[in-house]
């Protein structure tokens, strides 16, 4: 799944991504980078709304796993169980969130668990 295909998928399946005007800059085995402009994600202080920053980070992490699973022939059913984010400073312009799929060991464990028909968990980080 390339960047254009992922962006189309997100806009069709996750309507919030279209409302936030996200653009997928890169998508591949190495990870995903998503850009969001300021205007549709602005708050009352003329900076990025914290919920928008969190949503774009989650989209990047979810997408990195989704792209990798599809590349491996796994039909993904991904659910975000927990999300935590630290806000270190206001974001005053369009911004990107970047995420990579799990490292080799975590990926191998995830695939093995899914192959046994069991629910699996994996931790994925995103950086805004």
Q: What is each of the regions a protein language model found here?
A:
Residues 64-105:
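Hydrophobic beta-strand-centered segment that forms part of the acyl-chain substrate-binding groove
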Residues 35-62, 74-75:
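Hot-dog-fold acyl-thioester-processing enzymes
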Residues 27-30, 90-95, 128:
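A short, structured loop/turn motif at beta-sheet edges
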Residues 60-64, 124-125:
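Short, well-ordered amphipathic alpha-helical segments that serve as non-catalytic structural scaffolds
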Residues 19, 31-33, 82, 94-96, ...:
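Intrinsic-disorder/low-complexity, polar/charged segments enriched in Ser/Thr/Lys/Arg/Asp/Glu/Gln
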Residues 1-35, 39-40, 74:
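Non-catalytic linker/capping segments at the edges of enzyme domains
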Residues 92, 102-128:
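HotDog/MaoC-like acyl-thioester-processing domains
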Residues 18-22, 81-87, 109-111:
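Short structured motifs
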